[in-house]
Amino acid sequence: MTAPGPLNSAAGSLYVVATPIGNLDDISARALKILREVALIAAEDTRHSARLMQHFGIATPLAACHEHNERDEGSRFITRLLAGDNVALISDAGTPLISDPGYHLVRQARAAGINVVPVPGACALIAALSAAGLPSDRFIFEGFLPAKSAGRKARLESVKEEPRTLIFYEAPHRILECLQDMEAVFGGERQALLAREITKTFETLKGLPLAELRAFVESDSNQQRGECVVLVAGWSAPQSEDAVSSEAMRVLNLLLEEMPLKRAAALAAQITGERKNVLYQVALEQQKGE
């Protein structure tokens, strides 16, 4: 991490401005004011952002700041800032730097003693988490997983026993493969949620155990379109047999003699009132120990 330089009072400010992820009504009045008043807007895609600016009647000049030029072109923006100009940084949608460009520019600005000002707003991962019904007091954001299955599984294995809620971004053309790998690594019973096209017309938030969520996406090609956020419940230590009543264990063991583990756990839960996922974990650990 680059240590921030002494604040340069003669320099302008770099405003890190969140923009809508779908619904244009989500932009804040403060964001619009800043975008109108700054001397320059550093945008991930100037053509995309030009349409947004046109919609709101903003005539501020745009300059490209994306992953391919950010390291080299950052000095251009720093020069303007040091000359006293205010600059806004935006991405195509949501909050800059969150799986989007901007990190190198912000780092350079702070190193040069330039005031960096966050202008909060839309963020897909926070929006999804707020509506997921999964623990939100502690969570980790893993961004986009590797494109190939081997790399993806390796990353998933590294967080398999992470107790905090897991949040991932995924591209629509890889969402099914992603869920298949999650099911293979985390197990089909792990609770998860797919948040797709947040704030847009076809917004979908579907919460199911991973096996059922994978089947849901597999059966409906419409669920393989649009921007995706996947949330997965954190790992919890397997329950011991002591945590399950002796009657529930008796029923479970009888059913395991006649049917597969998943079905036995589900039926035993219906009969005894115990939680299905607890019975499933107990049976799984029991089989591993045999």
Regions found by a protein language model. Name each.
Residues 104-162:
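Class I SAM-dependent methyltransferase SAM-binding "motif I" and its flanking Rossmann-like core
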Residues 34-41, 113-117, 165-166:
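Short active-site oxyanion
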Residues 1-66:
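Glycine-rich, flexible N-terminal cofactor/catalytic loop recognition
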Residues 13-17, 83-91, 139, 164-168, ...:
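Generic beta-sheet signal
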